[in-house]
Swiss-Prot record:
Cleaved signal peptide residues: none
Identification of the protein by name: Heat shock 70 kDa protein PPF203
Keywords for this protein: ATP-binding, Nucleotide-binding, Stress response
Alphabetized GO MF terms: ATP binding; ATP-dependent protein folding chaperone
Top-level taxon in the UniProt lineage: Eukaryota
UniProt xrefs under InterPro entries: HSP70_C_sf, HSP70_peptide-bd_sf, Hsp_70_fam
Family under the similarity heading: Belongs to the heat shock protein 70 family.
Keyword ATP-binding: yes
Gene3D superfamilies the record matches: 1.20.1270.10, Substrate Binding Domain Of DNAk, Chain A, domain 1
Amino acid sequence: EFRETAGGVMTKLIERNTTIPTKKNQIFTTYADNQPGVLIQVYEGERAMTKDNNLLGKFQLEGIPPAPRSVPQIEVTFDIDANGILNVTALDKGTGKQNQITITNDKGRLSKDDIDRMVNDAEKYKEEDEQNKNRIEARNNLENYCYNVKNTLQDENLKTKIPKDDSEKCMKTVKSVLDWLEKNQTAETEEYNEKEKDTEF
């Protein structure tokens, strides 16, 4: 069982053939400044990208207070009971707000044949999936790095400690990399990695 993260990459929470009942949780966050909500999408399958897996259900967690990206902490819990019924809960740790979805065995779940086919496909496209996943992760890492630098430069407590010229130079670099990211949505892993090396302060 999975949920989707930025760029359509799957985050695997429960492995195939896990003994039930079982419960797993993981912390996720926002990927835009002042993002008011997050969409939790639950998938079943073996592939690295969401588009190649089976969507079981989705729900929205709203009411996240304005904050820079990556600051809110959203705890997502997958809980499968002894009957195979899946409860997925998303909790905003800052406000205590939560929402959930229940997915029963008959709700769009894959048959054994479908699962076998997906396992075979996962093996067949393993290399391609890995390349896609690495590319998107490299892009996300570069974007996160830029936003972390930007937030640091705008932090009131640190502003006085960084010389104004350095701060302006760094901010200019960060903005140009974010513009480049916007225009190069499908660059290769190496390009994103090189860009991150060039941007390190």
